[in-house]
Amino acid sequence: MKKIAFIGECMIELNGKPFAEMWQSYGGDTLNSATYLSRVSSSKEIQVHYVSALGTDNLSKQMLKYWQADGIQTNWVLQDEQHQPGLYLIQLDAQGERTFLYWRNQSAARYMVQHPDFAKVIAELQQVDVIYLSGISLAILPKNDRTFLIEQLSSLAKKGTEIVFDSNYRPKLWDSLEEAQDCYLQLLPSVNIALVTFDDEQALWKDKTSRDTLERLHKIGIPKVIVKCGKNGAIFSDRYLSQYGQVIPEPILNVVDTTSAGDSFNAGFLNGYLRNKSLEICCQQGNRIAGIVIQHKGAIIDKVAISHLQSEFN
C-alpha cells in the first residue's frame, strides 16, 4: 500500500450570487485533491492522509465527518480551540469562470505549525511515501512557519519521501512577487514532481512557453514536471526516463465551474503515479476526472458523478 499526505487548508465555501441564493460547502486546493484521489482509488492500494488544523466548532466537526466518509485519514488534522476554519465566496460568470473573496487570516490552518502537536505530525510523516502541498499551503502560513515547514520537508526528502508540489500561485496571498519566488525557490530543490499550471508559472517567472517552464524546473533539479495548460491538456517530462509528451483532453462543451479543474487533475494523476503508471497515462487520468468535475458546480462535486472512475482507473 502507498501512503500519501496532503498538507494545506480547507475552508467553508459559499457559492452563488451576492445577497441572493447561495449554497454552503467546503473546499481548498489540497483538500480537493485529497478528496478526489481518495474517491477514485482503492483503499487497499492507496491511503490518503490530510494534514491541517480545524477549530472545535460544529462546522469543523462536520467537515471532519465528511472527509472521513470519503476515506481520508484525519488523525493528522489538529484541533485548535482558539481558531475556526477560513471562509471563501465564489462568484461565477456566464462562462463558468470564477472570482473569489476570502476570509482566512485567522483560520486554524494558518497556525497549524505553531500547534503543540505539529512536531508529532512531522515525526509521523516519515511513514508516508509521498507528501503533497501547494503554494497556497505555504502562502497562508506566517513567514517563520513557512521556513520551518520547508526545512522539515527538505529533511524528509533527504530520507526518501517524495515531495509533490503544485505552485498554485495566488498573488493576493503574498506580500510581493519576490516573496513568493524566494519561498518557492527554497522548496523546489526538494521536489520530485512539479504539478504546475502554465498561467501560474507565467505570472511567477515570466515563462513564454510551457516548454520554458519544463526546462526551468528541470534545471532546478526536479525530475518529473507536468505543466497543465487548460483546454490544451498537459505536457509532461521526465528527465531521467526521457519521457516527453502532451495529453490533450476531449473538448468539454458544458463548462459550469472550473474551480477544481487543476486540483482534480492532480488527483487523477496521482492515482496513476502511486500505482506506477506512465506519466502519459497519469495525465490522461487527470484530464478524465477534470473533464467531469468542471461540468458541475463547486469545488467538491457529488461523488456519484465520478464513482465509475474507480473501476476505470484501477
UniProtKB/Swiss-Prot annotation:
Associated pathway: Carbohydrate acid metabolism; 2-dehydro-3-deoxy-D-gluconate degradation; D-glyceraldehyde 3-phosphate and pyruvate from 2-dehydro-3-deoxy-D-gluconate: step 1/2
Keyword Cell membrane: no
Binding site for ATP: 168-170, 228-233, 260-263
Chain positions recorded as substrate binding sites: 28-32, 88, 102-104, 170, 263
Record-linked PROSITE patterns: PFKB_KINASES_2 (PS00584)
One GO CC annotation: cytosol
Source domain of life: Bacteria
GO MF annotation list: 2-dehydro-3-deoxygluconokinase activity; ATP binding
Transferase as UniProt keyword: yes
UniProt xrefs under CDD domains: KdgK
Pfam entry (one): PfkB
Enzyme Commission designation: 2.7.1.45
Disulfide links within the chain: none
Function text: Catalyzes the phosphorylation of 2-keto-3-deoxygluconate (KDG) to produce 2-keto-3-deoxy-6-phosphogluconate (KDPG).
Identification of the protein by name: 2-dehydro-3-deoxygluconokinase
Organism this protein belongs to: Haemophilus influenzae (strain ATCC 51907 / DSM 11121 / KW20 / Rd)
Gene that this polypeptide is encoded by: kdgK
